[in-house]
């Protein structure tokens, strides 16, 4: 290991060992209670300063602003009442709910052969997570998926939790200005003003939404993915053969949840994948997804042709028993689709897709993922692992967008969706990729048509190929658009896309970009309450409440840093201008003065008198305004609260 890599690992180890609660500025963790004592739904509440509405500097008239509640994915990492210890893991939030259903059993040990081998290897003791939980599995003849419960008409605690979470406490806002919202264009999405537990249950039962919630990941806070809910964002982390360590990946996990990652995928392809994943799961408040194929390939020393169902089956069980909430499975890539990619500019760019394509050609038969798909569903049903049906033939360049190969695979994914639903296994569909703006909607339309309204989950799409280093932007454009059209979850892209493994700062930039895209999509759809935060920030901006502007933003730290680069003094936090326009050309400051001016009845009466005089002498009004300006000291701008009409 190089000295720089060793130092990065040591720094990460130090960081996770000394993790302390780091709340957002002027925010606090609150909990909204449900129907039972153990349903406590976290929100982040942002406190706001009062609005100045009149008076003088010495005796101002103030009106309080209600705090704003926002969706929170950070778990206990922002709860000051919790002592963080990554060696003990997170509280098992859902453990009691799972026990109460009495349809699971505790296993005496791990079922996977590979897991048994890892546990018996003493050389891994230093790496291994020490507080391993007891494994659960469905009792014989039982199905433990949220889809199964929903179809039985059962509203689970998870569903109630989600209903509270999706509403974000917006019912309490009475302020007409905050509640103002433009009508959206939902493209057929059903967006009720209030999300109820029954609505959640019905959406899951119909297959339009999933609750990724493995019974072996009770630490995860329940969330939902579906086009009739808030658009979600996934963050990818994971080591490679040349970069990163367990400590760095745990650090990136915590970092991802802080900046709004609704789910996290561990895409590790390097050493110690099993141990890395255990550390991540035990410390993750959000659902964790994987691509099991990556680890299966490592087990056969990276030779795709040597993969087989036995290795894959053992890997699925291994990961399900650890607690992985959803698997990406590239089962829709069929042998006959591979030649369709021959004339592509960029061929097959999906790692999982290329592995399967190579295996299919080497054996000249359909992949074991396709031929054993029903067995995959049986495994998932025992642990409530959701399936994310992977798009192994997604376009890797805009030249290849919406081609025959891509849509042929999509239709097969729709067929597999119906098979998974036979086993009450939850399903989402993965999508592209690289697609120019004018071709994006066709992807959403085709997915809804062929995949029976199962939730769509896309990587971007990237709308142009000319910006390596800025692909978080090229893809953020496409993500906002497809989110508006109905995509349920967006997989983030970082500035390092196509260039290298992202570091912490890249993860943050990718997440902020995609939270922005998701929010823009929610606004465009007309999701109820989506505009409240925008309205609160705009009001703060107009009133020059700088701290509130920072704190209401997606990234308060960067917003404050940018402001302070040019106005670092504390006086800059109360100034009625910023460095963009300066004190004399601030449009909002001038607008405030105009508003105050218009409010003054004496001034209105005076102007009316001037207007009458102007009928007799058009220059009289000009002369009077000139006199007013000189009498006020010939100053172009005055503080809005001090402005007094000059009497002639």
UniProtKB/Swiss-Prot annotation:
Residues annotated to bind Zn(2+): 434, 498
GO biological process, one term: thiamine diphosphate biosynthetic process
Top-rank EC class of the record's enzyme: lyase
GO terms under cellular component: cytosol
Catalytic activity: 5-amino-1-(5-phospho-beta-D-ribosyl)imidazole + S-adenosyl-L-methionine = 4-amino-2-methyl-5-(phosphooxymethyl)pyrimidine + CO + 5'-deoxyadenosine + formate + L-methionine + 3 H(+)
Binding-site residues for substrate, renumbered to this chain: 236, 265, 294, 330, 350-352, 391-394, 430, 457
Cofactor comment: Binds 1 [4Fe-4S] cluster per subunit. The cluster is coordinated with 3 cysteines and an exchangeable S-adenosyl-L-methionine.
Binding site for [4Fe-4S] cluster: 578, 581, 586
UniProt keyword Lyase present: yes
MF GO annotations: 4 iron, 4 sulfur cluster binding; carbon-carbon lyase activity; zinc ion binding
InterPro entries: ThiC, ThiC-associated_dom, ThiC/Bza_core_dom, ThiC/BzaA/B
Name of one Pfam family that matches: ThiC-associated
Required cofactor names: [4Fe-4S] cluster
Pathway as given in its UniProt record: Cofactor biosynthesis; thiamine diphosphate biosynthesis
EC number(s) recorded for this UniProt protein: 4.1.99.17
Database matches in HAMAP family: ThiC
Family indicated by similarity: Belongs to the ThiC family.
Role: Catalyzes the synthesis of the hydroxymethylpyrimidine phosphate (HMP-P) moiety of thiamine from aminoimidazole ribotide (AIR) in a radical S-adenosyl-L-methionine (SAM)-dependent reaction.
Alphabetized PANTHER family for the sequence: PHOSPHOMETHYLPYRIMIDINE SYNTHASE, CHLOROPLASTIC, THIAMINE BIOSYNTHESIS PROTEIN THIC
Protein name, UniProt field: Phosphomethylpyrimidine synthase
Taxonomic lineage from the root: Bacteria, Pseudomonadati, Pseudomonadota, Gammaproteobacteria, Vibrionales
This protein's encoding gene: thiC
